[in-house]
A protein has these predicted regions:
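Bacterial extracytoplasmic/cell-wall-associated proteins, especially those involved in peptidoglycan
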Residues: 1-111
Length: 111
C-alpha cells in the first residue's frame, strides 16, 4: 500500500508515469539494496504525498513489481520536474545520466 501511495504522490495519475516511478523505486531496491519502501523513500529523498493511491499506481506497481516488467529497458534511479531542473543550475540531477522525459518529469540513471 505504501508503495502505491508514494508512486501516486511522486507522479500523479498517469499510468505510464506511475510505471516509470515504480521502476525507479524497484531499481533502488535491486541495485542499492534497500530493504523496504520506507527506506527507499527516506534514502532517495522522495517527497511525494503518501495520503492516497490511484488505480493507475496500483496497476503500475502490479506491472513492475508483481509481474516483473519494465517501463523502459534502462535503469532509472532519479527524477525531478523539468521546472526544478531548469530553475536550479548545477543541481544534483544535472550530474546524472539523463534517460528520458515523460510529461514534465525527467528521469536519470547514474553514470
Amino acid at each position: 500500500d505504501m508503495l502505491e501511495r508514494i508512486v501516486t504522490g511522486e507522479f500523479g495519475g498517469s499510468y505510464v508515469g506511475s510505471c516509470l516511478i515504480a521502476q525507479s523505486i524497484k531499481c533502488a531496491i535491486v541495485y542499492d539494496g534497500y530493504t523496504s519502501v520506507s527506506a527507499v523513500i527516506k534514502g532517495m529523498g522522495y517527497v511525494g504525498s503518501t495520503a492516497n493511491r490511484s488505480q493507475n499506481a496500483v496497476n503500475a506497481v502490479k506491472y513492475i513489481f508483481d509481474d516483473n516488467n519494465l517501463a523502459v529497458r534502462h535503469r532509472l534511479f532519479y527524477m525531478c520536474t523539468k521546472d526544478y531542473y531548469d530553475s536550479t543550475p548545477g543541481n544534483f540531477h544535472s550530474t546524472q545520466n539523463f534517460i528520458l522525459q515523460y510529461e514534465n518529469v525527467l528521469f536519470f540513471d547514474r553514470w
